[in-house]
Amino acid sequence: MHINNWPTHERPREKLLAHGAATLSDAELLAIFLGSGLRGHDAVQTARNLLHTHGPLRELLDRPPGDLMRLPGLGLARACKLTAALELSTRHLAAALQRGASIHDPISAGRYFAQRLRANPNEVFAVLFLDNRHRAISFEELFHGTINGAEVHPREVVRRALTLNAAAVIVGHNHPSGNREPSPADQMITQRLKNALDLIDVRLVDHFVIGDGAPVSFAEHGWL
C-alpha cells in the first residue's frame, strides 16, 4: 500500500508536523528523506530494509558518500544530499556552541559531543570549557585512547581550565562499541575529575557518554 493510502495519523510527514521529529522512528525519518521507495516498496519499507541490511543508523550514516551511493534506494543524488544534511546538522550545533555562545541547553551540548565524537573508532575524551556566564571558551579533545578506553588525567583538565580562566566545564567521551552505559571506570574518573576541579572552584556541569542513541548525561541521572 502506498503511503498516501495510509491513515493520515500514521504517515511520517503528518506525524512529524503534528508531534515533532523526535517522535518518529529511525525508519520513518529516513523515509521522509528518501521521499519514495524502490519498485514494489514504499519509502518506509525501503528505509527499514536499508537499516536492517546496512544499519544500525549510526553505521549507515557514518558511511562515506561513495559507499552510500551504492546502497539500494539511495544513489548518487540522495547520498550527496544525506551527507550534506549531516554536515549542516554538525555546523548548526557548532554554531550554537561557538566561542562566546551561552550554553543553557544541555541537550544541545550533548548532541554536539555526539556529533564530534561518535564516529571515532577509538575512545576520545573531550572537554568544553565555559566562562562564568556559561559562554563557550574552547572545545578540546584532550585524551585519545584505544577501542577499549582512554586514560584521563584530571590534572591536565585542571591545567587547561586555569590557562583558559574557565569557570565551568562539560566533559564527554565516546564508547566505540556503541554501548552508552557508563562503566565503573567512567564513574570513578568523573568523581576524580569533579574533586580536582572543586579545588580550583571550577564546576563540572555534566559528563556525556556517547554511544548508539541519545547521549547519557551524568547530571540528568544525578551522578554528579
From Swiss-Prot:
Binding site for Zn(2+): H173, H175, D186
Keyword annotations from UniProtKB, A to Z: Hydrolase, Metal-binding, Metalloprotease, Protease, Zinc
PROSITE patterns: MPN, UPF0758
One GO term of the biological process aspect: proteolysis
One Gene Ontology term of the molecular function aspect: metal ion binding
CDD domains, A to Z: MPN_DUF2466
Domain MPN: 102-224
Coiled coil, from the record: none
Highest rank taxon of the organism: Bacteria
The keyword Zinc is assigned to this record: yes
Residue window of motif JAMM motif: 173-186
Family: Belongs to the UPF0758 family.
NCBIfam families: PRK00024.1, radc
Protein name (record): UPF0758 protein PD_0117
